């Protein structure tokens, strides 16, 4: 027997070594490690132990009986059979447990089948010890019955003790040490009642025995929702029928028969399904407004300035505050040139005196700001608070000028100016930035109408002014409040000059979170402040978007708002177009970090974020910023202006790269942008335009910092285009005035690159400031060449008067702007006397050349026989030599008559033949005296002479004589 045990000693050790890790894990999971030593296993009395030969014959497999109809108990029976059927090997040595093998095992498939309906997946809390269930170990129980009893008698997960003596393997836990030094481990589980982030594992519902429900909501809940909708529909139909019956009754019968409604919905009957929460929780009083207090007070003060005209109440005198006034006077005395803030300017405008018609100086108030901040609600509440009946119109609907005029006059003049309850009207024009310029001009015309007091002060006739006012309309005596989203719309430029401009700032997050929490509590929706803050950040503090998002989530059946629900919900986002300065601000400035950055490599270069594909964890925040800037620039729309602003401002930032590699990378991105635009517009490849918004996103990654950038509006491109157009105009003017001989050799490109730079030196000779009669022959020749050069290039000096009253001579056209850079030092200019002398000589030379040209043109006519001022003919009529012109005293009428030659043209017929008329011989009785030939010749000569006299009735200066410039020089 001893020999037999010695032979089996090694085999038992091999068996123990082979299954040591599995036995250790099973002992730990079944809770039997505390009752038995590590090397032994307890066998129930109902089943005899197997012999060693049976164990060897069975090998590693263990018989696993499984009853029919219960396939889910295969794994559980496996563990039971291992524990019950395998014999306990007797080993004199206790083996060391292999913990590293335990860590590598995956028990999730086995443990997920033991989950309870209320336990989350992955819960592997050890079950109670087998000692709690002694009846299961009796011999009369089979394996299937034992499994059924075990499932029936296991305690619920909520009743299990969460305090463990050993750390769990597949659950999160925290360790706690008592005062006595004992350490315990607490299992972390989700809180199903308290607020917080909702665990998606808790939404898994169980159905039957261990089967998951395929629906996200239990069938019972769905049935309740359907029943509630049907009940609500019946209530709506009943209410609609009741309203129809009441509308058919007369007013007297309705007053008599009026009683309680037939059926009223319960107080918690989802009234939000009939109306929007935005309308339900809209502020009704001044104290309920969420907008800025200063803006609210300014608008209310401006409305109170109309009290004298509208209500007939005098403006209350403001009580002086001695401390504040003395301090303000002292500040103004010490710093008279200090710029006033926007608040101070608004206060002074509101404290200013009224106009002669007892109206405020600004006849209209303009509220501007992003959508969703409550501008329209602010106008309604403040107007009602001031005692007005609000009349609202949308400028985007009534776009025609006539409709715009009709609506405005109907609200202020044509109809009764008293609204509901005898209150005067206050006109609120919403979305006025969508109105065309013609409609804005109509509004300006109504605002600029003057009263009789203003007409008397202006000195105009009262009767004519009154007739004109009756034709155009009466004086505006009601306040008008305009609302816009973009104050920089071109159509609002003239209106802003006459309006009280009030910019509505974003709502404070604390106020908005408090209001949202009140709305959630009133509707029974649980929400923690963190989720509400995340909602405000997602919607940019848009009141309307926040409330609509809450109502949407509430309508979808969600009764608890969590941060995850806010982040995964795409409702509440709006396609808001930001201004250019807002886009540039977000590109060049990092957002505020509300928590410490984890996993961000601060030593990583900026351009590596665009080019590398390294660790995704370190680029999480950078990628989020990248996509945010990409979305902002895409919604901006004005890509060319955005890129031009980036180009003008990125070199003014604080660069962190001493090697300027980021600057080179930015220039490469700008070149890439130019190539994309060129390919898109020239090659009609418009699909490439989708890559343009990546340029601002790349600039954000390269140059964004926590410092506030000083951004200026881009003007370099506009200045360059203006200078280019001016240069082209100067060159075109210069070329058009050149002489043909000079123009043939001077092209615009040659003038700009070669000629004009040297021409400026030629036009600035050294001339003495004396009379030209004192010049030497060389100086006269130099002056003559200068005048000839300037005339050849169509250059001259023109006298201009400066704003301070001085006179200057400037070169016209100013070619100095074309070829001289502003940074270069200017050449020594000519004196005022030298420029004046050159300008006089240029004008004299122009007159000489014009006279010579006219004389040259009249030369051929003189040769042909026309009488000119310098043409003399011999008495015989033949062309002779040209003689000097006679003197004035020799030019008499008789001499002109002798020189004049009368040539009569013969009469011709239609075909050009000379007509010969027969002269009838008159009788001696009727023969008239013949006209004197000398008198006839004198009349013809006077008509062709250089001096003639013509009588014009009522005019005495009828003597004319041709006078040439050469006669005066």
Swiss-Prot record:
Q: Localized where?
A: Nucleus
Mark out the compositionally biased spans (Basic and acidic residues): 876-889
Q: Which GO terms describe its biological process?
A: chromosome segregation; DNA replication; germ cell development; male meiotic nuclear division; negative regulation of chromosome segregation; positive regulation of DNA-directed DNA polymerase activity; reciprocal meiotic recombination
Cite a single GO MF annotation.
ATP binding
Q: Which residues carry this modification: Phosphothreonine?
A: 51
Q: Which residues are reported to carry the modification Phosphoserine?
A: 221
Identify the stretch(es) annotated as Disordered: 30-97, 250-269, 318-340, 856-889
Key word Nucleus present: yes
Principal location: nucleus
List residues binding ATP. 369-376
Output the Gene Ontology cellular-component terms. Answer: Ctf18 RFC-like complex; cytoplasm; male germ cell nucleus; nucleus
* Cross-referenced Pfam families: AAA
Q: Which SMART domains match?
A: AAA
- Low complexity composition-biased segments: 257-268
The family line of this record is: Belongs to the activator 1 small subunits family. CTF18 subfamily.
Q: What does this protein do?
A: Chromosome cohesion factor involved in sister chromatid cohesion and fidelity of chromosome transmission. Component of one of the cell nuclear antigen loader complexes, CTF18-replication factor C (CTF18-RFC), which consists of CTF18, CTF8, DCC1, RFC2, RFC3, RFC4 and RFC5. The CTF18-RFC complex binds to single-stranded and primed DNAs and has weak ATPase activity that is stimulated by the presence of primed DNA, replication protein A (RPA) and by proliferating cell nuclear antigen (PCNA). The CTF18-RFC complex catalyzes the ATP-dependent loading of PCNA onto primed and gapped DNA.
UniProt protein name: Chromosome transmission fidelity protein 18 homolog
Source organism of the structure? Mus musculus (Mouse)
